[in-house]
Design a protein with these regions (language model features):
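Active-site regions of enzymes building and remodeling cell-envelope glycoconjugates
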Residues: 12-15, 178-184
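A structural signal for short secondary-structure junctions
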Residues: 84-87, 133-136, 161-164, 177-181
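Cofactor-binding loop segments of dinucleotide-utilizing enzymes, especially the Rossmann-like FAD-
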Residues: 96, 145, 172
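Glycine-rich, anion-gripping cofactor-binding loops and their flanking helix/strand elements
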Residues: 125-159
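Short, polar loop motifs at secondary-structure junctions
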Residues: 169-177
Length: 184
């Protein structure tokens, strides 16, 4: 909600600061956290989530602001990357499973902020026409954070690299494997 005076904001149980941008990142993040909190509640209510795991999840939520802050520390490599690829007119995001939802949000944010044409595609659908859109030098942001589909995502990365895309990989902290397959 962009303006705190809106009826929806006044009637909501969630209170977050007004969004001061086109890309509604606070609202998106708040929705994710609210959904996670609800899932924890339901998991405990029906006995499918033990107290130890629930506590671990809640601690993780509490640590989110600090983690997000470290992600956005801009270093020289990121600045150089932005200068080199910021002029591109197209970008593609790839993800599987939960990463596909994040890829869709990433594409939306890139469109909203930079006015660069950006689309997100499910990795499993890559061969169904999407691959034809990939051409030399086009940036492809590949999300590979889900262990159960990691190998399939690496296969997708190889496919777009074969078409000479520039692949930016996003993986889990400490994941050395994805770095072997991406350009950045």
């Amino acid at each position: 909600i962009s303006v705190s005076a809106f009826l929806l904001n006044r009637s909501s149980d969630l209170r977050f600061c007004p969004e001061i941008s086109v890309a509604s990142t606070k609202a998106y993040t708040t929705q994710l956290v609210a959904g996670l909190l609800f899932a924890v509640y339901l998991g405990q209510l029906n006995g499918k989530l033990d107290a130890a795991l629930a506590k671990e999840i809640l601690i993780g939520i509490h640590e989110l602001p600090e983690l997000i802050h470290t992600i956005f520390e801009v270093d020289e490599d990121m600045k150089a990357f932005a200068k080199h690829y910021g002029f591109k007119t197209d970008a593609f995001f790839l993800g599987r499973s939960i990463d596909y939802a994040v890829a869709m949000e990433g594409a939306l944010k890139l469109k909203e902020i930079s006015y660069i044409h950006a689309e997100a595609y499910a990795g499993g659908e890559l061969k169904h026409g999407t691959l034809a859109l990939i051409e030399e030098g086009v940036p492809v942001i590949a999300l590979a954070t889900q262990e159960d589909v990691f190998d399939k995502m690496i296969s997708n990365i190889r496919e777009v690299k074969a078409r000479e895309a520039v692949v930016i990989g996003i993986g889990m902290k400490g994941d050395e494997e994805i770095a072997k397959h991406v350009d950045h």
